[in-house]
Amino acid sequence: MATPHINAELGDFAETVLMPGDPLRAKFIAENFLEDVKQVCDVRSMLGFTGTYKGKRVSVMGHGMGIPSCSIYVHELIKDFGVKNIIRVGSCGAVHDDVKLMDIIIGMGASTDSKVNRIRFNDHDFAAIADFHLLETSVQQARLQNVNVRVGNIFSADLFYSPEEGLFDKMEKLGMLGIDMEAAGIYGVAAELGAKALTILTVSDHIKRGEKLSSEDRQKSFGEMMNVALETAVNI
């Protein structure tokens, strides 16, 4: 049954949904990586698709930008459509000197300046972490593909244009590998509703060094990340 934000029917989504931020990226993934594709939703142009990868059902849907947006879609997918596994696929900025452009980062945990998880946990700190089985499977699949991945803590920011000076230096000191805007929220929703979640990111920018990927390199690293994510989706 359709929800306020997802006009699909029960059974339209696979148990595992890959979620990029951009709905057009979801369409690209469906058209270029999946077979037997069916579009299942389009409310507010947030496109969702279900198809098969190596004979197994997989869905892909955009989640928008930021924790409030992604939390709505993840909540409804899990609670109303029976989705069991959420795998966020996207890009991130890096601040750590040891992280390079095109690195693939798997978010074992996600710190944040958002208060959403404190709201969930009576104003206490909540350790927003990936599901271990998804994490372990993704690392195994990356190794089978000879794809190097970095596993560690990331930071989910509420502000893209942050005025907070000195924060990047502190992130580097604490060993945070990348900065996105959604992972901590997705992990929180999944934990609250009893589902599993993982975040896989490609480094598209190095914030402290002022480096950015070219379009060609961005596409190459995206392809490697998608292969890891899809192999994870069909091997859990």
UniProtKB/Swiss-Prot annotation:
GO terms for cellular component: cytosol. It catalyses: a purine D-ribonucleoside + phosphate = a purine nucleobase + alpha-D-ribose 1-phosphate; a purine 2'-deoxy-D-ribonucleoside + phosphate = a purine nucleobase + 2-deoxy-alpha-D-ribose 1-phosphate. InterPro entries: DeoD-type, Nucleoside_phosphorylase_CS, Nucleoside_phosphorylase_d, Nucleoside_phosphorylase_sf. CDD domains: PNP_EcPNPI-like. GO terms for biological process: purine nucleoside catabolic process. One of its GO terms (molecular function) is purine-nucleoside phosphorylase activity. Keywords: Glycosyltransferase, Transferase. The keyword Lipid metabolism does not apply. Coiled coil: none annotated. A purine D-ribonucleoside binds at H5, D180, M181, E182, S204, D205. Phosphate binds at G21, R25, R44, R88, V89, G90, S91. Pfam families: PNP_UDP_1. Catalyzes the reversible phosphorolytic breakdown of the N-glycosidic bond in the beta-(deoxy)ribonucleoside molecules, with the formation of the corresponding free purine bases and pentose-1-phosphate. Homohexamer; trimer of homodimers. Belongs to the PNP/UDP phosphorylase family. This is Purine nucleoside phosphorylase DeoD-type 2. It comes from Photobacterium profundum (strain SS9). The gene is deoD2.
